[in-house]
Amino acid sequence: MSPLLGLRSELQDTCTSLGLMLSVVLLMGLARVVARQQLHRPVAHAFVLEFLATFQLCCCTHELQLLSEQHPAHPTWTLTLVYFFSLVHGLTLVGTSSNPCGVMMQMMLGGMSPETGAVRLLAQLVSALCSRYCTSALWSLGLTQYHVSERSFACKNPIRVDLLKAVITEAVCSFLFHSALLHFQEVRTKLRIHLLAALITFLVYAGGSLTGAVFNPALALSLHFMCFDEAFPQFFIVYWLAPSLGILLMILMFSFFLPWLHNNHTINKKE
């Protein structure tokens, strides 16, 4: 009976965690509806929507990370949840990036003004910190056996490789994800969301054991805030500079190098 009771308790805890994540999604969705109706100033509108989107992403990822730690022997279950919630975020967070790298990409490609970009970046960073403390307050309620507020304030270093490999991992993940984001724009919405969710799941599978495969500076700040405090240079390089480097390389390749290569090839064919 004891193993059965343990299994039942574990199942209840998992369902509670899933319920919390879906509740966050619903609450943020309701808040977005209210914000769209009540906020008419573009700056305030952009700030609030980006804040809510980043809050949703960070809170759900905190809970997903906790679930993955409780089920290390079942990585398929964790990856299934990553895919499912990537779909949920893709469907509900339309028009926001929840990622400073996405804002940087839009600004560098001329799709967003510097002023709007700065507002969105500020919203993401503030939301990342708020989500951390809200998650800690929620965990302190002890809704499940592994919801302990102290967990969110402990530094668990997710970097399991040397600095160079960690930088390459985060840069490559950022490069691949934002390349797909850029080139899937003409794909039908329903298919695009599934493709991006599958890509995110693959990147988490491939890079999760190395750095956590975050490729999002705001999310990294929320997940590993205490680690930033204890080992700032390392975490700044891996989780902020490396994804930004991936964005820069992506833009250089698709906006400059490949067009230049194509033009040279065309000229050579004419000659």
From Swiss-Prot:
Pfam families: MIP. Detected in the sperm head and tail (at protein level). Expressed in subcutaneous adipocytes. Expressed in testis, kidney and ejaculated spermatozoa. GO terms for molecular function: channel activity; glycerol channel activity; hydrogen peroxide channel activity; water channel activity. Residues 36-41, 96-163, 216-234 are lumenal. GO terms for biological process: endosomal lumen acidification; glycerol transmembrane transport; hydrogen peroxide transmembrane transport; intracellular oxygen homeostasis; intracellular water homeostasis; negative regulation of epithelial cell proliferation; negative regulation of ERAD pathway; negative regulation of response to endoplasmic reticulum stress. It is found in: Endoplasmic reticulum membrane; Cytoplasmic vesicle membrane; Cell membrane. GO terms for cellular component: cell surface; cytoplasm; cytoplasmic vesicle membrane; endoplasmic reticulum; endoplasmic reticulum membrane; intracellular membrane-bounded organelle; plasma membrane. It catalyses: H2O(in) = H2O(out); glycerol(in) = glycerol(out); H2O2(out) = H2O2(in). The chain crosses the membrane at residues 15-35, 42-62, 75-95, 164-184, 195-215, 235-255. Keywords: Cell membrane, Cytoplasmic vesicle, Disulfide bond, Endoplasmic reticulum, Membrane, Repeat, Transmembrane, Transmembrane helix, Transport. Channel protein that facilitates the transport of water, glycerol and hydrogen peroxide across membrane of cell or organelles guaranteeing intracellular homeostasis in several organes like liver, kidney and brain. In situation of stress, participates in endoplasmic reticulum (ER) homeostasis by regulating redox homeostasis through the transport of hydrogen peroxide across the endoplasmic reticulum membrane thereby regulating the oxidative stress through the NADPH oxidase 2 pathway. Belongs to the MIP/aquaporin (TC 1.A.8) family. AQP11/AQP12 subfamily. Homodimer; disulfide-linked. Homotetramer. Can also form homomultimer. The NPC motif is essential for oligomerization and water permeability function. This is Aquaporin-11. It comes from Homo sapiens.
